[in-house]
Amino acid sequence: AGTDRPLEAAGVAGAGGFEGTIGAGGAGGVGGAGGVGGAGGAGGWLYGDAGAGGDGGVGGAGGTGGLGNRGGAGGAGGAGGVGGAGGAAGLWGGGGAGGVGGTGGGAGLGAQSVTFSSSLSGLSGGDGGAGGAGGAGGAGGTGGWLYGGGGAAGSGGDGGTGGQGGAGGAGVFSLFGSGGGPGGNGGVGGVGGVGGAGGRAGLFGVGGLGGAGGDAGDSGEGGFGGPGLAGGLFGNPGNGGVGGIGGDAAAGGAGGAGGNGGAGGNGGWLFGNGGAGGSGGDGGAAGRGGAGNLGSAGGINAPAGNPGSGSVGIGGAGGAGGTAGLFGDGGAGGAGGAGAAGGFGGISAATPSAGSEGAMGGAGGVGGNARLLGTGGAGGVGGGGGAGGDGGRGGVATPGGQGGDAGDGGAGGAGGNGGGASGAGGWLLGTGGAGGAGGNGGNGGKAGFSPGPTNFGLNGAGGGGGVGGNGATGPWLFGDGGPTPGSTGAGAAGGHGGDAQLIGNGGHGGAGGTGVPNGSGGAGGLSGLLFGEPGANG
């Protein structure tokens, strides 16, 4: 085993010894808090496990395995440190797992505020320092050349308070493809970590799944999902990772946006289907507005309540579907995330305090294309718009005074658009994919209550529905254009039906959304140049 140096803050620990022909490599030594863990020793050339990397400020790398053995695991990172990479296997063994990233440090405290005498105002306290970033996860080790799978990537460490979560480690090439590690979660005010990419497959293997994006802390943005990676000659790819959820706001603050979904991987070159795009994360909710102060006796109530937050988290966009192999189907686009609801208005005094508008839903992802004989992937559904926040309640009058007006309700958020033109059908035979439906518009917020004899507020307007995605064009020789769902929200126009090309019928136009006014129907797709019927209008 390598020499430990845990008490030397920046020391580098000794590496583990290695074996010649048959036998296990030694473990790497443990490094100090700011040092590097020792690398694991290599396993024997013919037979023998590799030694594990030592823990440290930066984890040591795992050693390489023998011909028939597994690579050593990477050491864990210290506080904020990077996890060590997993060791590679020889001929048959699996790669070692990557080390976990260290947790970021907490935020520093702000300076305490100073209070003066009653005739002067006190000074504000200082802001707290930013939290440390979480360490990145180590990469997974490479699988054995013939049979071994790649090691899993280490997950990113959590960010400290105010810190950003670490990115997930990427998967590595192997016969069967290892998955990416998930992104670390952000601390309060922190951004979620990005999910790691899935591992690439070998000749027959399946691509690794993209890592999920980390969830955000309060007011932070959700991390993006990692992309799925392509399959081998015959294998299917990994799907895109799901976007992280946006953080909720503190009182009166803004909610964070949801992370975007990762793109689906492409199918194997010959037979594989395209992977589905990951769904977008939901937006974070906004905070409630603060209450107004009461006026003095005998007068009108003076200061108004703070309005609800005008900035709420929008839903993340769905990831695009992957392209198919020569004979496979395109992957479906991911659904858009939901928009967050608007914040409630505070209790008003003389001036009304309105609720804030709901956020827009995320757009659906585009469907993946087929190549020769397959069906195009469907476009993703748009996310629903968030509901508008309710208006604030009118303030109660003090003796001899006048009550405050009630606040108006916030407008509902617009629904997300459906996936745009969805995937095209195969060049020779196959059907174009359906367009994604638009998301529902959010409901308007309710008016606040007034105790009188003052004004009641108005109800907020509902949000418009998202526009449905267009259907895909049909294949060059035979086949129909894709159908197009209409918008599911209020008043939006339906999408255009897909056009046929040489022989085939046009797709049906999407229905218009209901509302005031109602949305117009989408136009039907064109017929094929030689034979076919045009699509009906929505």
Q: Where would I find each of the regions flagged by the language model?
A:
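Glycine-centric low-complexity repeats
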Residues: A1-G538
